A protein has these predicted regions:
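Terminal domain-initiation and capping elements
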Residues: 1-77
């Protein structure tokens, strides 16, 4: 089973705030963080990671939520 971590577009966080949180929480390269933030902004959601264990996905989701992002996990189909 694969657990996907998703970031959703919202009316609160700016593009820059989303990219910043992805860099800080995931140590994601700035270019990748900007691309993920743009995808969330344009399509409403961006997958930022996929994990074979539920616990790491939940931990990352909680950290993103602590930054104020609208993040969730789902089981990949």
């Amino acid at each position: 089973m694969t657990w996907r971590v998703l970031v959703h577009n919202d009316a609160i966080n700016s593009f820059a705030a989303v990219a910043y949180a992805l860099v800080r929480v995931l140590s994601m390269p700035v270019e990748h963080a900007a691309a993920a933030a743009r995808q969330a902004y344009e399509s409403g959601v961006a997958e930022i990671g996929a994990y074979t264990e539920r616990e790491p996905a939940e931990a990352i989701t909680a950290r993103l939520q602590a930054f104020g992002l609208n993040a969730s996990i789902e089981v990949a189909a």
